[in-house]
Amino acid sequence: MPKLIDHDRRREEIAEATWRVIHAEGISGVSIRTVAAEAGISTGSIRHVFPSKTELLVHATELVGQRAWVRIQRHLAEPEPRALVLSVVEELLPLDAERRLEMEVTVALIAEAPGNARVREVLDESYEVVREVCRRLVTRLRRAGLTAPGVDVESATTVLHGLVDGLAIHLLINPDPDFRRQALRMIEASIDGLRS
């Protein structure tokens, strides 16, 4: 009897192998061959799922967003708005090995994007999703009375989004636990600053 393959799981395993190759060798090390070797499967098996390197990179990019969304959803039932905002923002920062790897992959793919329109398209979509998450967080704070009455939601969204993106890069460069604590305090100060 032929072996049944869970195609969604196989796609995820291949994307994870792509992440590991990017982590070890950078984006230039990614090929159907290197990813197949990392995943422990044949190049034919990879080509069956991802006919090109671009499709492989696109799925690797999409998986980063999917994983972040799953983590974010765990916090959406948090009744206290400030705690909700802080917990969601933390999910967007490279504060552990899993999120650090995802951020390394994202940065590598950002560098690849100017020469790859399809990767650029997926990254643009991811950018808009994160911006919308930030907008909803600011709106939630405003509705809960945790911002000044006249706060400009769009401006506050831009500030929060920029702070998250900037701190993500800084945390990637400097994973020191003291800096992690400082970064989280900066997020808290920014959120609390919306009250004035």
Q: Which role fits each region the language model picked out?
A:
Residues H7-T18, V35, A60-V64, A68, ...:
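Generic hydrophobic, amphipathic alpha-helix propensity
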Residues E13, A17-H59:
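Helix-turn-helix
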Residues V21-A24, E38, V49, R67, ...:
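Residue cluster at the C-terminal edge of the helix-turn-helix DNA-binding motif
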Residues G26, E112-A117:
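Short loop-to-helix capping motifs
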Residues E55-L56, V88-L95, E121-E128:
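A ubiquitous short alpha-helical element
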Residues H59-E62, V70-M103, V153-L160:
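Hydrophobic alpha-helical connector segments
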Residues R74, E98-V107, A117-R143, S155, ...:
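Amphipathic alpha-helical packing segments from all-alpha helical-bundle domains
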Residues A83, R118-D124, R142-L194:
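Hydrophobic/aromatic-rich alpha-helical bundle segments in the mid-to-C-terminal region
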